[in-house]
């Protein structure tokens, strides 16, 4: 192939498409370390070693997105993005390799690289365990051009460590290749993410796709009949009407002085919890700057049940991001440049990551994300409960309880914004 032709990678909802670059340097040694998964300490699962890093990556990425715009909703999956790039790092070398892992908040002087990949392997295995009450699945797919020969070790590692499926496609037929990739993601997300790939470079030779799908029911649902239209204050001058779910009951809710925010934890049936943060007026940026893995862990470990009159907007939001810009702010730049070293993926031609796009969708309603026929009764103290209205911008996270991993992070500025 002529050296003037450029190949690249595309990452959508975790999709990475690889396509060649015009120059390549000699490999500077295999940066990947051998990963030994022959044994696991059952009392200290390996995913525990990477969960703090995932959380800090999540908050760093969130702050970059918030910095780009304070007037738009935010919603993304840190687990999806980190999994895709950690998997890609298996095929990178030299600075390209170290930048990705450091950008994901892994310090290889503190945690061996073998444990990073072993942690993702265990995390994905745990997330994909069947749960009769909660639907949570992740998937990784490799789409290879018919003529491309991958390095055997890379193919073995992504299958073994990241449970990846491999498919052969003809990227010369861009429409058919797009259809195959989009069908894979649409099926994996049960129709929630469709037409993920809008455009596909004819020179693409390799696509790496990661998706995560979550569908849960509130442990204690809202009554549809209690949902009423109320005002949501987008900013000092903008107010919109939104359907507001309402319930008087016992909640794991408290006011946090450190964050200047109300903190609400709502469990899903199964092993997931949503954490909502409602900051005081003018304290949104303070909240965003103060959130850390340690704070989230303390909230998850402590129960603060009290009576409250809760008002939470019913909403459906979508987040779509070009990650090249935002990850560049986190130090991940080399993989997008002509100096990228992806010789661990294939030795046939130099590659670079041409595009990285992430898409995530969220629906919050009375039952969670699907209808549920649950009924329950609870005693309410006679004292007058506080009224907590999420009727202004707020931040939220969705946490998988077994792994304490941040499945999704978001901010609602305007519930009517699609």
Swiss-Prot record:
The gene is SERPINA1. Residues 1-24 form the signal peptide. GO terms for biological process: acute-phase response. Glycans are attached at residues 70, 107, 271. The keyword Glycoprotein applies. The record marks 382-383 as: Reactive bond. This is Alpha-1-antitrypsin. Residues 373-392 are annotated as: RCL. It is found in: Secreted. It comes from Pongo abelii. PANTHER family: ALPHA-1-ANTITRYPSIN, SERINE PROTEASE INHIBITOR, SERPIN. Keywords: Acute phase, Glycoprotein, Phosphoprotein, Protease inhibitor, Secreted, Serine protease inhibitor, Signal.
């Amino acid at each position: 192939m002529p050296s003037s032709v450029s190949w690249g990678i595309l990452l959508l909802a975790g999709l990475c498409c690889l396509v060649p670059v015009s120059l390549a340097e000699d490999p500077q040694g295999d940066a990947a370390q051998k990963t030994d998964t022959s044994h696991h300490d059952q009392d200290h699962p390996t995913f525990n070693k990477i969960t703090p890093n995932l959380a800090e990556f999540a908050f760093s990425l969130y702050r970059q997105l918030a910095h780009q715009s304070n007037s738009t909703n935010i919603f993304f999956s840190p687990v999806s993005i980190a999994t895709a790039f950690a998997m890609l790092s298996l095929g990178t070398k030299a600075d390209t390799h170290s930048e990705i892992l450091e950008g994901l908040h892994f310090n290889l002087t503190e945690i061996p690289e073998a444990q990073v990949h072993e942690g993702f392997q265990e995390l994905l295995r745990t997330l994909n365990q069947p749960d009769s009450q909660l639907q949570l699945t992740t998937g990784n797919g490799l789409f290879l051009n018919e003529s491309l020969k991958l390095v055997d070790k890379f193919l073995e590692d992504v299958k073994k460590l990241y449970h990846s499926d491999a498919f052969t496609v003809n990227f010369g037929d861009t429409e058919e290749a797009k259809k195959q990739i989009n069908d894979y993601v649409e099926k994996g997300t049960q129709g929630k993410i469709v037409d993920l790939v809008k455009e596909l470079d004819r020179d693409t030779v390799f696509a790496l796709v990661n998706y995560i799908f979550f569908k849960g029911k509130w442990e204690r649902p809202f009554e549809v009949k209690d949902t009423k239209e109320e005002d949501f204050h987008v900013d000092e001058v903008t107010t919109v009407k939104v359907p507001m779910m309402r319930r008087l009951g016992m909640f794991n809710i408290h006011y946090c002085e450190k964050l200047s925010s109300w903190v609400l934890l709502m469990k899903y049936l199964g092993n997931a919890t949503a954490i909502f943060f409602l900051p005081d007026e003018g304290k949104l940026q303070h909240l965003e700057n103060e959130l850390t893995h340690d704070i989230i862990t303390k909230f998850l470990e402590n129960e603060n049940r009290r009576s409250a009159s809760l008002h939470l907007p019913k909403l459906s939001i979508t987040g779509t991001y070009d990650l090249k810009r935002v990850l560049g702010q986190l130090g991940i730049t080399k993989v997008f440049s002509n100096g990228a070293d992806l010789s661990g993926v294939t030795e046939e031609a130099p590659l670079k990551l041409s595009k990285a796009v992430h898409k995530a969708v969220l629906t919050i309603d009375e039952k969670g994300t699907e209808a549920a026929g649950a009924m329950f009764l609870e005693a309410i103290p006679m004292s007058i409960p506080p009224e907590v209205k999420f009727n202004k911008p707020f931040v939220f996270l969705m946490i998988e309880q077994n792994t304490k991993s941040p499945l999704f992070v978001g901010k609602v500025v305007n519930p009517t914004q699609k």
